[in-house]
């Protein structure tokens, strides 16, 4: 897989360069909320390699390693730290969830509230980005069990890395453990394709869609981003607003109509599915045959943490999965080789 090795070499060069070009001084407080920080940085102008486009990846000869939230079984969900580690470990695509804040900024965050990651209560859409970025996004992460919020204090080794209560790992700073904006994540990894799920729906969806399109266009990333949502209405609204040149995956209603009722699938590049919907097995041979006939790739996300291991990833690839949205990118990289 020489092309993949070339992309890997370019990516690692940029990660190392970015790590060496930034320095930071910050205050500390023993809590799960950080104080304001003062950042001093030296910028080196470097011509980044363009990321492979979604079309390039659909033609790949190997199963794609798609790091779910940066690899949330191995690293704190949706942190800059996790995404950097995923790149080093061989991810082909960074997967992330986005939501809109009270002040109209798109942030990378899965849940409607911050409770599950930060140890603080609050609703993302009711908080400003400044308020969100004070929180410790690694508060509840544990390498022994994620998501588990009833373990002993010592089972959360990065708790306080954002606030100064715990020292961040070597080479990282407190900022790497905060809730990040989509723009900053996409800017930090210009060489990485992105799989972006819009979590907001209803009244919040339009704001999230507008912000996402604005950020994608500002970064000239239309051909290296694929957009997904569980809501078929959100995907339809996104496609109408963005036009046809940003790749998408169908929402649940459209998927059900396609698979069960034989309804035509819209203009999508990829279907993203779990191995099971409840008790219903999705990845049966007829599903892969239907996808092949429709000309779409199949990316699989895990429906249970027990599936997050090398053997299961290998089994999914053997079934016919084109990409694995996984929480352990290092394990998936061994499958891809």
What feature does the model see in each segment?
Residues 21-36, 41-337:
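Phosphate-group recognition and catalysis centered on beta-loop-alpha active-site segments
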């Amino acid at each position: 897989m020489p092309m993949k090795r070339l992309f890997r070499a370019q990516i690692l060069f940029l990660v190392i360069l970015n790590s060496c070009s930034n320095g930071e001084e910050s205050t500390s407080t023993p809590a799960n909320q950080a104080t304001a920080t003062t950042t001093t940085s030296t910028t080196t102008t470097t011509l980044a390699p363009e990321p492979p486009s979604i079309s390039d990846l659909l033609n790949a000869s190997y199963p794609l390693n798609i790091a779910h939230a940066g690899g949330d079984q191995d690293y704190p969900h949706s942190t800059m730290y996790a995404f950097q580690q995923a790149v080093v470990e061989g991810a082909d695509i960074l997967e992330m969830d986005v939501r809109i804040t009270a002040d109209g900024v798109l942030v990378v965050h899965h849940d409607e509230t911050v409770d599950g990651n930060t140890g603080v209560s609050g609703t993302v859409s009711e908080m400003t980005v400044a308020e969100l970025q004070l929180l410790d996004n690694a508060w509840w992460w544990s390498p022994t069990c994620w998501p588990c919020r009833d373990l002993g204090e010592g089972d959360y080794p990065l708790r306080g890395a954002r606030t100064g209560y715990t020292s961040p790992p070597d080479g990282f700073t407190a900022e790497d453990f905060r809730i990040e904006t989509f723009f900053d994540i996409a800017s930090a990894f210009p060489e990485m394709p992105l799989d972006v799920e819009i979590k907001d729906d209803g009244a919040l969806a339009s704001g999230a869609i507008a912000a996402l399109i604005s950020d994608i266009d500002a970064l000239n990333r239309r051909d290296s981003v694929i957009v997904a949502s569980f809501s078929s209405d959100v995907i339809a609204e996104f496609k109408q607003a963005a036009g046809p040149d940003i790749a998408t995956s169908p929402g649940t209603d459209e998927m059900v109509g396609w698979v069960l009722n034989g309804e035509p699938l819209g203009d999508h590049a990829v279907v993203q599915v779990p191995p099971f919907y409840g008790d219903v097995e999705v990845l049966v041979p007829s599903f892969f045959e239907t996808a092949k006939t429709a000309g779409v790739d199949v990316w699989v996300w895990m429906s249970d943490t027990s599936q997050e291991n090398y053997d299961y990833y290998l089994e999914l690839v053997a079934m016919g999965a084109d990409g694995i949205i996984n929480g352990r990118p290092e394990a998936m990289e061994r499958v891809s080789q």
